[in-house]
Amino acid sequence: MDIENDIRNRRIIRNISNLLDDDILCDVIITIRDGEEIKAHKTILAAGSTYFKTMFTTPMIARDLVTRVNLQMFDKDAVKNIVQYLYNRHISSMNVIDVLKCADYLLIDDLVADCESYIKDYTNHDTCICMYHKLYEMIHIPIVKYIKRMLMSNIPTLITTDAFKKTVFEILFDIISTNDNVYLYREGYKVTILLKWLEHNYITEEQLLCILSCIDIQNLDKKSRLLLYSNKTINMYPSCIQFLIDNKQNRNIIPRQLCLVCHDTKYNVCNPCILVYNINTMEYSVISTIPNHIINYASAIVDNEIIIAGGYNFNNPSLNKVYKINIENKIHVELPPMIKNRCRFSLAVIDDTIYAIGGQNGTNVERTIECYTMGDDKWKLLPDMPIALSSYGMCVLDQYIYIIGGSTLYIDYTSVHAVNSIDMEEDTDTSNKVIRYDTVNNIWETLPNFWTGTIKPGVVSHEDDIYVVCDIKDEKNVKTCIFRYNTNTYNGWELVTTTESRLSALHTILHDNTIMMLHCYESYMLQDTFNVYTREWNHTCHQHSNSYIMHNILPIY
C-alpha cells in the first residue's frame, strides 16, 4: 500500500510540474529582464512562497483573473530557476548567489536554506572576501553573518591578498564601523586595515571622513596615530586633517583605574593576583587569581585585557606559557606559547601586537625578541637585541620600544618575598646601555648611555620625553632619582630630581602628567607621585587589610 502511495504522490507531483509546460489555466504572468514573460499558476506559487501567498490573497489582486508580477530587478535565469523550483523541477547551482537574493525577496525559506548550505560548503579562507562582496547587503541571513565572521577573524592575513586590495568602499566601511563585540577590532588595527586599503584604492574626501569618524582617535595608540597623521591620502583632504587636529588634544590618555599585578602572601605566595586600584580613594578590589605557581613573569594590558607571560616556578627554571584574563568577566584564556622560555623580562604593547624582549632562559640571558599579534596562532622572532639583557626598564613611545639598563648576567632565583629586590653587589653585571627598537623598520638603535648601571628601573614616557626612576648610591646612602631624556634633542640624560627616602620598589606609571610609584608591602600601600611640570613630590601611606607584594602596575582606560 505504501508503494502505491509513493507512486501516486510522484504522479501528482509530475502532473503539477507539467502544468508549467502545458501553459494552460495560467493566472499569473511574471515579467523578467529583456521583456521576457513566464506564465504560472497562483496556487502553486503561493504554496511555496510567502511573498506570493500574501500578494495573491490581497483583496484587490485576488479579484484579478490574471495578475502581473514584475521581477525585472533580479537576474532572469535566477527567476526562471526559482519558478522551476516551485514546480518541483531540478535547478542549477551555477547562479546560486542570484537565486539566494531572489528567494530571500520572495520569502521561499526552503530554497534560502538550500542556497545557504551550498554557499557554506564553498566558502573558505580564500573565498570569504569574494563571497561577502556579493552578499554583504543581506546581513540578516545567517550565512552572510557566517561569512562576515570568517572574514573578520582572518583579516590579519586577508589584508595582504588581492581580494582585499579590490574590496569596495562599502565593505571597508562595514568592517571598520562594526560595533558587534563578536568581531570588534581595536582602534589601532582599524588604522592598519584602512591604511592597507588606501595603498590600492581611491577614496573621496567624504568617504574618508566617514571612515575616520568610526575610529576613536583619542584612544589610539601612538604608533597608529603617527601612521594616520602621516598618510599622504589623508593629508590631501582639509576636512580630514581638521578632524584629526580636533581629536589630537588629548595626547596623553589618563587611566581611569590601575591594574595591580601582585602576589598574595596571605594565601598562596606563588599565585599571581590581579587587583583593580582606584587612584583617588587608594582602594582596590581583587578580580582574579591565576591558578599557576609562577613568579618573575611579565605582564601587560592589551585593550583592557591582562596578559601574563613566562616566569618561573621551582619546578621549571623558565616558562613560555601565555595567558589572557578579561577584566570584566574574569575569564582566563591560554594564548599560543612564546617561542622562547623567559623570566625577568618585559612585555611591550603597540597597537594589538605584544613584544617579548630578552630575559632569562634557564641560566642563559636572552638577546632574542619575539612578537605576537592578537588573533594569530603563533609568535614570530624579530631581530636580536645588540646585547643580552634581563631585568631592564622599558617603555613605549610612538613606534619605538625603549630599553634602559638591565642585567647582562644570570641572576639567581629569589624567594617570592624578595621578588622586588635584586642585590646588585652579588653576581650581577648591570648595564648602563640605552637602546630602542623601531617596530616599523625592525631595527635596533643605540642611544646615549644612562648615568650608571641600573636594574629594573621604572621607565615612563610623557609627550616627547623618557623618564627613568631608579636608586643611585652615593658615599652616604641611596637616593631615589628621576632622570629625563628628550627624544627630539638627543642631548643625553638630565637629572630632574632626587628624594632622600628610598622607595623599596619602583613600580611606576604615568597618570595625569604625574609619575606615580606604588608599592604594596605587608599591610601598607605606599603611593609616591612626582609632577613633571611642577616638579613637586607627594608621599602617601595607606594601611589595608591584605598583604601583597606588587609585581607590576598596568593602566585600565
Curated annotation (Swiss-Prot):
It is found in: Host cytoplasm. It holds the Pfam family BACK. GO terms for cellular component: host cell cytoplasm. Residues 26-95 form the BTB domain. Keywords: Host cytoplasm, Host-virus interaction, Kelch repeat, Modulation of host E3 ubiquitin ligases by virus, Modulation of host ubiquitin pathway by virus, Repeat, Ubl conjugation pathway. InterPro entries: BACK, BTB/POZ_dom, Kelch-typ_b-propeller, Kelch_1, SKP1/BTB/POZ_sf. PROSITE patterns: BTB. Residues 143-223 form the BACK domain. One of its GO terms (biological process) is symbiont-mediated perturbation of host ubiquitin-like protein modification. Kelch repeats lie at residues 305-352, 353-399, 415-464. Its main location: host cell. Transmembrane segments: none annotated. Interacts (via BTB domain) with host CUL3. PANTHER family: KELCH-LIKE PROTEIN 32 (PTHR45632:SF3), LD33804P (PTHR45632). Probable substrate-specific adapter of CUL3-containing E3 ubiquitin-protein ligases which mediate the ubiquitination and subsequent proteasomal degradation of host target proteins. The BTB domain is responsible for the interaction with CUL3 while the Kelch repeat domains supposely serve to recruit the cellular substrates. This is Kelch repeat and BTB domain-containing protein 2. It comes from Cowpox virus (strain Brighton Red).
